[in-house]
Amino acid sequence: TEWLPNILTDHHEMGTNSSFFFQPGVPERKNPLISDLNQALTREIGTYHEKALNSIGSLYYSEEDYDDFFFGKASTYPDANGSIGILFEQGSSRGHIQESVNGILTFPFTIRNQLTAAFSTLEAAKNMRVKLLNYMKDFYDDQIELNPKSSDNIVFGKLKDESTVHHLADILNSHKIKFNKISEAVSYTHLRAHETHND
């Protein structure tokens, strides 16, 4: 079976003197491939975090410090795949208890904030179920429309390191990108500079 979550959360710690962060991140530092609707849904989910964190008296912030740009991050990768990725960053107690500019910070307090945000995410997912399902459906429908079948072909390979090709094939397979092994030698007449690596 395939796992396609509607929301994926990524829980981390940050510097002790910080409070609690949740996405969306800095608006100007969003990957241009992430839709405005994705950010609007992330912001709407954020209202659930606000309410929950207010109810326990915890400080928090959003739309500062952290980006939503690099797709290699656990909180951004879902955004490129029809899901909503959310990063949580909790000021770290660096053990059981530590002083901070906001007062004494304890390990149980940091756990409580992360758990509260996890529960508020579940509440948002339940209440926004139809929106999130429609968002994912529309995301995949749009990808099909934006990427019609093309007759263009890309040839890739690496003569000195076949394992690189096998690893790339694994990645392509995991994303359901179809490819075939060529059956005969290929010669090129028009190559761009980045395509002429001989190794």
Where are these regions (language model features)?
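Metallocarboxypeptidase
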Residues: 1-187
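Intrinsic disorder/low-complexity detector
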Residues: 154, 196-199
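Conserved small/polar residues in nucleotide/adenosyl-binding loops
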Residues: 189-197
